[in-house]
Curated annotation (Swiss-Prot):
InterPro entries: DEAD/DEAH_box_helicase_dom (IPR011545), Helicase_ATP-bd (IPR014001), Helicase_C-like (IPR001650), P-loop_NTPase (IPR027417), RNA-helicase_DEAD-box_CS (IPR000629), RNA_helicase_DEAD_Q_motif (IPR014014). It is a peripheral membrane protein. Residues 307-488 form the Helicase C-terminal domain. Keywords: ATP-binding, Cytoplasm, Helicase, Hydrolase, Membrane, mRNA transport, Nuclear pore complex, Nucleotide-binding, Nucleus, Protein transport, RNA-binding, Translocation, Transport. A motif (DEAD box) lies at residues 243-246. Residues 1-10 have a biased composition (Polar residues). Belongs to the DEAD box helicase family. DDX19/DBP5 subfamily. Residues 1-68 are annotated as: Disordered. It holds the Pfam family DEAD. Residues 35-46 have a biased composition (Basic and acidic residues). PANTHER family: ATP-DEPENDENT RNA HELICASE DBP3 (PTHR47958). This is ATP-dependent RNA helicase DBP5.
Length: 495
C-alpha cells in the first residue's frame, strides 16, 4: 500500500540565466525567485464503450480523461542504426510490458485499458534494459505522467531494506504539480506493497527531517537543499524525471538547480524529460542534460489542442478588459474557469475588485506560500471555487477536469530585453489553453486584446501553430454570450 511523507527545506537563491532568452512566468518587474514562485481507447474487445484513462491528476483529484487525438509521434533512437519502426519499440496493450501483478491491478483500478499513442511508443523504450535516457514531447493530456510513473514503479526494489531508500526522483516546477504527480503515483501504486512516496516542496514539515521513501517528488531547490544537508541519500537512485522539463531547463534559477541536483546523483541514473513543448533552443540543453537519449517529438502544427475553441476579444483599454471580464462572470461559472494574468499585482487587484462586487473568485500566485496554496488549489479542484485567477504558476501540468474556459487576460509574452517590440510566448499559450478542452470535452480559450502590440502577438501565435483564433465583437454582447454558451454548455451538461 502506497503511503506518503512530506519533506521541506527553505528555497535556494536563483543562479544566472541559462540562455539569452528567459521567459518570466509571472511577468513581475523584479527578477524571478526560486521554485516557490513557480507553481480513451475502446475496451479490450474493441466493441465495448469507451473506458477513459484519467490523465494528469488521479480520479479522486478530479483529473480529466485522456486526450488521444490523431497525431504522429516521431521517434529518434539513441542507437542510430536501429529501426524506430521495429515492433519491439511499440506496444498495443499494457500486458505486452510484462508488468508485475500489483502494478497491473493499479492500472485496472485507474481504468487504464489500452495505452495512449504516446504510451505505445514511450513505454517500450522507457522500460527496456539496460535503461536508456529519454526526451519526450506530447500534447497536454495524452498520458505523459502515467508513462513515467509506470516506468518508475517497474524499476523499484521494495525489499524491507530498500523500500525507504529513494530510488526515483521526480522534479516539477511547482508544488501544485508535485502534489498532483504524487496523487498519480499513489493511485497507480495502490496495490504495491512497501511503496513510500515523499513530497519535497517548500513549507511542509520539519526542515531537518530525513527523506525515507521509495519515490521522491519535489521542486529543484528543496531537493538540492536536502541532498546538500545529507538528508536525502542518493546512493540507490535509478530514475530521474523532469516533468515540464523545458520550463525548468529554461527558467533562470530552476535550470541551475536542476543541473546541480543532477550533478549530485549517480552517473548511471536513467534521465527522463517530459513536456508538451520543447523549443529548439531548449532542446540543446535537454540533450546535454540527458545525453544519448531516445527522442519522441511532434510538429508545431500537431501541438494545438483539439476540442478547444480559440477566440479573442477586442478591448478598448485595460479598464475595458476588466469590464468585459466582469460581464463574463456568468459564463465563467458554467463549469470552472482559469484567468491568466501577467503579474501578481494584477491577480490581487482583479480578485479584490470582483469580490467587492459580490463575485466568488480566488487567486493563486507565487507570492502565496505553503498550506495556503494547497487550500486554494483544493478548493478549485472540488468546485468550492469555480473561478481561479493566476499567473503562469499554474500554466503547466495542472489537470482539473471541470475547467471549461481559459481566459488570457494578458497575452503570454517573452522577456526579451532590448527587443524592438513585445513578443508572444507561444509555448506558454499552448500550456495555458491546455488546461481546458480535455479528452471527450469541449473548452473555450478567450484572449483579451487591447492594443496593436497584443493583436500582433496573437497573430504570431496563430502563425506558429498554423491555427485560427476567431475574433468576437464585444459591441454585441448577446452574440458573445450566444457563441460561448453554444460551445461550453453541452460539455458542462455532459459532466
Amino acid at each position: 500500500m502506497a503511503s506518503e511523507n512530506t519533506t521541506e527545506t527553505p528555497s535556494v537563491p536563483a543562479g544566472g540565466p541559462l540562455a539569452a532568452r528567459i521567459s518570466r512566468p509571472e511577468g513581475d518587474a523584479n527578477p524571478p525567485s526560486t521554485e516557490a514562485e513557480k507553481p480513451a481507447a475502446e475496451d479490450d474487445s474493441g466493441k465495448g464503450p469507451s473506458i477513459p484513462q484519467v490523465d494528469g491528476a488521479s480520479e479522486d483529484q478530479r483529473g480529466s480523461e485522456l486526450q488521444d487525438s490523431e497525431f504522429d509521434v516521431n521517434v529518434k533512437l539513441s542507437d542510430l542504426q536501429a529501426d524506430p519502426n521495429n515492433p519491439l519499440y511499440s506496444i498495443k496493450s499494457f500486458e505486452e510490458l510484462g508488468l508485475a501483478e500489483p502494478i497491473q491491478m493499479g492500472l485496472s483500478k485507474m481504468n487504464f485499458r489500452r495505452p495512449s499513442k504516446i504510451q505505445e511508443r514511450a513505454l517500450p523504450l522507457l522500460m527496456a534494459n539496460p535503461p536508456t535516457n529519454m526526451i519526450a514531447q506530447s500534447q497536454s493530456g495524452t498520458g505523459k505522467t502515467a508513462a513515467f510513473v509506470l516506468n518508475i514503479l517497474s524499476r523499484l526494489e521494495l525489499t524491507p531494506e530498500k523500500q525507504k531508500s529513494p530510488q526515483a526522483l521526480v522534479l516539477a516546477p511547482s508544488r501544485e504539480l508535485a502534489r498532483q504527480i504524487v496523487g498519480v503515483i499513489q493511485a497507480m501504486g495502490t496495490f504495491v506493497e512497501g511503496l513510500f512516496v515523499a513530497t519535497a516542496v517548500p513549507m511542509e514539515m520539519n526542515r531537518n527531517q530525513r527523506v525515507e521513501a521509495s519515490i521522491v517528488v519535489g521542486t529543484p531547490g528543496t531537493v538540492q537543499d536536502l541532498i546538500k544537508k545529507r538528508l536525502f541519500n542518493t546512493q540507490h537512485l535509478r530514475v530521474l524525471v523532469l516533468d515540464e522539463a523545458d520550463n525548468m531547463l529554461d527558467q533562470q534559477g530552476l535550470g541551475d538547480q536542476c543541473i546541480r541536483v543532477k550533478s549530485l546523483l549517480p552517473r548511471t541514473i536513467q534521465v527522463v524529460l517530459f513536456s508538451a513543448t520543447f523549443p529548439d533552443f531548449v532542446v540543446r540543453y535537454a540533450h546535454k542534460f540527458a545525453p544519448n537519449s531516445n527522442q519522441l517529438t511532434l510538429k508545431h502544427e500537431e501541438l494545438t489542442v483539439e476540442g478547444i475553441k480559440q477566440l479573442y476579444l477586442d478591448c478598448e483599454s485595460d479598464e475595458h478588459k476588466y469590464e468585459i471580464l466582469v460581464k463574463f462572470y456568468g459564463l465563467l461559472t458554467i463549469g470552472s474557469s482559469i484567468i491568466f494574468v501577467k503579474t501578481r499585482a494584477s491577480a490581487a487587484e482583479i480578485e479584490r475588485r470582483m469580490v467587492a462586487e459580490g463575485h466568488t473568485v480566488v487567486s493563486l500566485t507565487g507570492g502565496i506560500e505553503g498550506q495556503k496554496r494547497d487550500e486554494i488549489i483544493d478548493r478549485f479542484r472540488n468546485g468550492t471555487a469555480k473561478v481561479l485567477i493566476t499567473t503562469n504558476v499554474l500554466a503547466r501540468g495542472i489537470d482539473v477536469s471541470t475547467v471549461s474556459m481559459v481566459i488570457n487576460y494578458d497575452i503570454p509574452e517573452l522577456h526579451l530585453p532590448g527587443a524592438a517590440r513585445r513578443m508572444a510566448d507561444a509555448q506558454t499559450y499552448l500550456h495555458r489553453i491546455g488546461r481546458t478542452g480535455r479528452f471527450g470535452r469541449v473548452g473555450v480559450a478567450v484572449s483579451f486584446v487591447s492594443n496593436q502590440e497584443e493583436w500582433q502577438m496573437l497573430q504570431d501565435i496563430q502563425k506558429y501553430f498554423s491555427t485560427n483564433i476567431e475574433r468576437v465583437d464585444t459591441r454585441d454582447w448577446d452574440d458573445v454570450e450566444k457563441k460561448v454558451k453554444k460551445i461550453i454548455k453541452p460539455s458542462a451538461v455532459a459532466r
